[in-house]
Design a protein with these regions (language model features):
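Post-signal-peptide, soluble extracytosolic/periplasmic N-terminal scaffold domains
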Residues: 1-58, 62, 66-70, 111
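Residues on the lipid-exposed face of transmembrane beta-strands in outer-membrane beta-barrel proteins
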Residues: 3-5, 52-56, 109-113, 166-170, ...
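Transmembrane beta-strands of outer-membrane beta-barrel pores
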Residues: 19-23, 58-62, 69-73, 127-131, ...
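Outer-membrane beta-barrel translocator domains and adjoining extracellular loop/strand segments
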Residues: 25-40, 76-83, 133-142, 147-154, ...
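Residues that define the transmembrane beta-barrel architecture of outer-membrane proteins
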Residues: 1, 46-50, 57, 101-107, ...
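Beta-propeller domains
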Residues: 71-72, 79-81, 92-94, 102-112, ...
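Repeated loop/turn-to-beta-strand initiation elements of outer-membrane beta-barrel proteins
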Residues: 10-13, 23, 60-65, 117-123, ...
């Protein structure tokens, strides 16, 4: 469903709503330690998307601002199956979590302008937030190896995901064109650390008593490229360009990588 309101010659407001329902049966790959199998997976989920915004269109420029929300609702919190192989250590069944209910919120801004010499500049920014608070499944279906109660009922996941982009294109002379772009992406995990102090279970068969805290990670990525074109003749053009990328990560074996071509 989409609705548009013309507020004036240059300004307009809009609202969009979309629902996607998925029901039926798919397939899932699961495992019991050293063995693997494919089993039917019931599907029963809904994705609702909402967007509200305003836009402005001028003689040689435009701007658009909107608020976007996407909600994922999975009626199934987990998938349980009978072990078709000879059970080991009491593991007659297995279980794994399905995709958790989650929500994504974004503020989106885009703008652009045209100037002399066939020059145009574009900018876009996305401020995003991801969250989920689905209940955690118990450690295992095998009571004989369970280390006890979970440290908390839900992960309460919370992450910020932002993006900024800039583009430039110009045709200053009849034979020369230049194009360039730059972007910055970042992911920041704000989820409170969760520690399984009494250990964990592997494949519903083995209990490991050591305390474990899953690592969280953040990253920042900066990318840029520029390309120039010179027309020697109608069918002969020379191109020159360069591109580069820098990626910084936390809690990884390699915390920074840099790539460049030209």
């Amino acid at each position: 469903v989409a609705v548009d309101w013309r507020l004036s010659k240059a300004f307009a407001a809009f609202a969009n709503f979309r629902r996607e329902d998925k029901e039926g049966t798919g397939y899932a790959g699961v495992g019991n330690f050293t063995t693997a199998l494919q089993i039917p997976e019931p599907l029963d989920s809904t994705i609702d998307s909402y967007e509200l915004g305003v836009q402005w269109n001028g003689k040689s420029a435009f701007a658009r601002l909107s608020y976007f929300v996407q909600e994922y609702d999975d009626e199934l919190n987990g998938l349980t199956w009978d072990n078709p192989y000879v059970p080991f250590n009491g593991a007659t069944t297995g279980r794994m979590a399905t995709a958790p209910d989650n929500e994504m919120e974004q503020i989106l801004l885009s703008a652009g302008a045209h100037f002399a010499y066939d020059t145009s500049i574009g900018f876009n920014a996305i401020f995003g937030k991801l969250s989920q608070d689905d209940a955690l499944l118990p450690f295992t279906t095998n009571a004989g190896v369970s280390p006890g109660a979970l440290p908390r009922a839900s992960l309460n996941g919370d992450a910020d995901v932002n993006h900024f982009g800039l583009t430039l294109a110009t045709h200053p002379l009849d034979k020369i064109r230049v194009r360039g772009s730059a972007s910055y992406d970042e992911r920041k995990d704000n989820t409170r650390s969760i520690t399984f102090a009494d250990g964990y279970v592997e494949s519903d068969m083995f209990s490991f008593p050591d305390s474990i805290t899953p690592e969280r990670y953040d990253y920042e990525r900066l990318r840029g490229e520029i390309e120039g074109e010179y027309r020697l003749y109608d069918n002969v053009r020379l191109f020159v360009g360069a591109r580069g990328e820098e990626l910084k990560r936390t809690e990884q074996d390699v915390d920074k990588t840099t790539e460049g071509t030209g």
